[in-house]
Amino acid sequence: MFTDKETHRKPFPTWAHLLHSEPSKQFVFGNWKMNKTLTEAQTFLKSFISSDILSNPQIITGIIPPFTLLSACQQAVSDSPIFLGAQTTHEADSGAFTGEISAPMLKDIGVDFVLIGHSERRHIFHEQNPVLAEKAAAAIHSGMIPVLCIGETLEEQESGATQDILLNQLTIGLSKLPEQASFILAYEPVWAIGTGKVAHPDLVQETHAFCRKTIASLFSKDIAERTPILYGGSVKADDARSLSLCPDVNGLLVGGASLSSENFLSIIQQVDIP
């Protein structure tokens, strides 16, 4: 376990330089979605934080609890190498938006990064690319790192439209960010989310390479090379190593398998470090 908070618990903006100088780092984020009570979260973190598996400085680990658990989780991980993420944010800083949470509110309680446009937000709550662009910008302006989630449906994939869909999501979703912004990308094919289907590593590599090329065209080659691109979609320990071996895969966005500390640690342990 890390004990030096100042060295190992720096906020994401500081990582921009670190990522630029050490591109081999891998990110593993666990999205709890709408799961866990306070008691369940405390039980999870008690066993999770104490694991020696988290002592590898080349693997950046994050948990993404529901809003109700963010404060408690922040207190629990504050002296650990674990970073804290939120599942979404509103694009406005404040206002009459009953039930919403803003980026300044999240930053104020110690959130480091925030998911933008997770497939469930896009397809269940009908969040559109222009709004997601505003949310990503709000995260940046509040001092957090946006994790822009992109992906195609099964119908879009089978029709050969994957790259067109991703290009549109990237072009609009990143359009409000400053030229030198630090952000993370997560490719999560909709047809693999919660279905048990995992994309073949060859397909994942091809898609991630396309995304990196697109980032280079939208920003610069330098930003493209240092931007982490994660894969998400029914990730389990059996698949973690083969996926992380892909040259353009810089980590994993884990869903259901992150609800068990044992399963999540197994995935982290399997991630390959170049």
From Swiss-Prot:
Main location: cytoplasm
Recorded name of the encoding gene: tpiA
Annotated substrate binding sites: 31-33, 194, 234, 255-256
Catalytic site: 118, 188
PANTHER family linked to this entry: TRIOSEPHOSPHATE ISOMERASE (PTHR21139:SF42)
Catalytic activity: D-glyceraldehyde 3-phosphate = dihydroxyacetone phosphate
CDD domains: TIM
Lineage top rank: taxon: Bacteria
Localization per record: Cytoplasm
Pathway where this protein functions: Carbohydrate biosynthesis; gluconeogenesis; Carbohydrate degradation; glycolysis; D-glyceraldehyde 3-phosphate from glycerone phosphate: step 1/1
Keywords, alphabetical: Cytoplasm, Gluconeogenesis, Glycolysis, Isomerase
Subunit and partners: Homodimer.
GO molecular function: triose-phosphate isomerase activity
GO cellular component, one term: cytosol
Protein role: Involved in the gluconeogenesis. Catalyzes stereospecifically the conversion of dihydroxyacetone phosphate (DHAP) to D-glyceraldehyde-3-phosphate (G3P).
Keyword Translocase appears in the UniProt entry: no
Protein name: Triosephosphate isomerase
Record InterPro entries: Aldolase_TIM, TIM_sf, TrioseP_Isoase_bac/euk, Triosephosphate_isomerase, Triosephosphate_isomerase_AS
Listed NCBIfam families: tim
Pfam families: TIM (PF00121)
Single biological process term from Gene Ontology: glycolytic process
Gene3D superfamilies according to UniProt: Aldolase class I
Enzyme class: isomerase
EC number: 5.3.1.1
HAMAP family: TIM_B
Record family assignment: Belongs to the triosephosphate isomerase family.
